[in-house]
Amino acid sequence: MCIRDSIYFARPDSEIDGVGVYHSRIQAGRYLAQDSPVEADLVVGVPESGNAAALGYSLESGIPYGTAFVKNGYVGRTFIKPGQSSRESSVQIKLNVLKEAVKGKRVIMIDDSIVRGTTSDRIVKMLRDAGATEVHVRISSPPFLWPCYFGTDIPEREQLIAYNRSINEICEVIGADSLGYLGEERLSQMVQGLPICKGCFTGEYPMKPPTRDIRGNFER
């Protein structure tokens, strides 16, 4: 299966081969707290797929979990919007920050991924504008380093923010105080050993990928 189903695409109340998606995301958050700890006052998730991982981080670290974002239910997922401009505008329309929840606090922001960096820098800025004194970003998946050829809109490597950048450089680009990713070795653990495709993280695909990009340019 595509590990992105458990991380992002699937509903939290669904199961994949008997393994609950909600449980997998909670576990990812726990692993993040173990492997990438930081002192803070509040853990928040970027809705919706970041919420369970944020709860897991809170349970493992003992840092309180809270709600920082109000989501506009009429806006779809920004990751699968067809163009860069539509992704950027959707972020601003999709989320509002609860200022009273984050003002004066050191915030850990949990999200499911950083692909192009379109949403992360804007959400970090929203938290700072709302009064957060620090914003520490934790991602419940490894860095995206390779494209997907099998159905997910993960573009050529040059469009991926992690391509040819260190974690510190990505942290600077998105404007966070610190940045941590889930380790690649944790992916199998979070889904209890189910066979998974993690080619977008490792470059190792379950079948030989095409030698050229056959997806075309859908952003024109």
Predicted regions and their residues:
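PRPP-associated nucleotide enzymes
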Residues: 4-220
